[in-house]
């Protein structure tokens, strides 16, 4: 899948979870959603994007970037 599509999907997921009152729990839940519902190759691709792209240059919103960086398992 194209990375731009994964970015759009991840940002959509983040837009739901960002409204949670506990930001750390929201990030865990957003990453958990990706972990549960995305295939291994999709998870690997978005994780590589986060690892290879400085946050300031990322097309992911800050919340999603941090959720993936901090909580998404390989």
Question: Residue ranges of each PLM-predicted region?
Answer:
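A domain-level signal for the structural core that forms small-molecule/cofactor-binding pockets
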Residues: 1-74
């Amino acid at each position: 899948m194209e990375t731009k599509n994964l970015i759009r999907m991840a940002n959509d997921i983040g837009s739901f979870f960002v409204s949670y009152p506990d930001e750390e729990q929201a990030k865990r839940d957003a990453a958990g959603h990706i972990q549960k519902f995305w295939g291994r190759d999709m998870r690997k691709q978005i994780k590589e994007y986060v690892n290879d792209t400085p946050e300031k240059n990322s097309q992911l919103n800050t919340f999603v970037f941090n959720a993936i960086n901090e909580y998404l398992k390989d």
